[in-house]
Amino acid sequence: MGRWCQTVARGQRPRTSAPSRAGALLLLLLLLRSAGCWGAGEAPGALSTADPADQSVQCVPKATCPSSRPRLLWQTPTTQTLPSTTMETQFPVSEGKVDPYRSCGFSYEQDPTLRDPEAVARRWPWMVSVRANGTHICAGTIIASQWVLTVAHCLIWRDVIYSVRVGSPWIDQMTQTASDVPVLQVIMHSRYRAQRFWSWVGQANDIGLLKLKQELKYSNYVRPICLPGTDYVLKDHSRCTVTGWGLSKADGMWPQFRTIQEKEVIILNNKECDNFYHNFTKIPTLVQIIKSQMMCAEDTHREKFCYELTGEPLVCSMEGTWYLVGLVSWGAGCQKSEAPPIYLQVSSYQHWIWDCLNGQALALPAPSRTLLLALPLPLSLLAAL
């Protein structure tokens, strides 16, 4: 079993017969497997706890990566300070309940009908504004208490001071729940390419990390999102959500929104998307445009919320937990709404992210309600062994 379900029995164990002990163990394993807890890496959407094998890709240019990869620990980020100004109620861990401050991917606003800026900020507490010299340039996503994930093409500027604004739905004003945090380190993928063919077509390895100068204080408005494992599979035609502020303007149109926007999109099959872009761009069919590290999502009405170039996160919900599955990377332009935007597929870069975090633990998804309700029986079985 994986770390998620591992238990250690200590002290003297009462003697039991071999058949009864084997039967109890078999029942325990079946219960845990049915609860989705055979191993953290095997649960759909969970981060794998297995040590990554691929060590060929390093992070550059401003970061030193460790020679060996850290294992993911069954723990939350090192800092869990709760600000009293925004934390109204603590949620103790009990049967059927999970402390949201000790897990990732938890949204503090469960009512999707609420559209006011404060409610939207609580609904997407991992959203941050990436800023250069104090001006918003892209969206970013909190993945750990000191780390923000974004796209590499937003980090190419030299001689600028990067910072992030967290906890605020507003792009141009501070609130009581918001804070500006300076960036300590900028990390870009070593194989990032601004273009593979021409102009806007086919950015490769468009991913970057920002290490903050201080750890974030989590609240209802500031929380990390969960990362998918390498075996995460998103079914075609799944419905997910894009959130962010969008472009400042495109061809004199689409003024940037002052508050966080949200848009539901439909996941497309990569092969169909690749065929579409071959017809759209006239690139020879022998050349693969949509790589396995990319993904497509259909959104045919982008005239108002244009988000193709600014790193907006693509997030999907599974059993009440939100996962970061993609980052907006490139596209044909919002005026060509029939062309689906292309996202970087986050699960393809799990190893790279592990390397660059250099041992800082990621928050893990909270155990499902099924598991919490099933645990008393396995524990009683263990006590009988």
From Swiss-Prot:
Record key words, sorted: Disulfide bond, Endoplasmic reticulum, Glycoprotein, Hydrolase, Protease, Signal, Threonine protease
GO BP terms in the entry: proteolysis
Pfam families: Trypsin
Chief location category: endoplasmic reticulum
Residues with glycosylation annotation: N133, N279
Annotated catalytic residues: H153, D206, T310
Gene3D superfamilies the record matches: Trypsin-like serine proteases
GO molecular function: serine-type endopeptidase activity; threonine-type endopeptidase activity
Subcellular compartments: Endoplasmic reticulum
Signal peptide start and end residues: 1-39
Enzyme class, spelled out: hydrolase
Cysteines joined through disulfide linkages: C138-C154, C240-C316, C273-C296, C306-C334
The UniProt record lists the keyword Kinase: no
Entry EC no(s): 3.4.25.-
Tissue specificity field: Testis specific. Differentially expressed in some breast cancer tissues.
Domain spans labelled Peptidase S1: 93-358
GO cellular component, one term: endoplasmic reticulum
Entry keyword annotation includes Hydrolase: yes
Described purpose of this protein according to its UniProt entry: May be involved in proteolysis through its threonine endopeptidase activity.
Additional record remark: DNA hypomethylation is accompanied by the expression of the gene in the testis.
Family membership noted in the UniProt record: Belongs to the peptidase S1 family.
Entry protein name: Probable threonine protease PRSS50
This protein's encoding gene: PRSS50
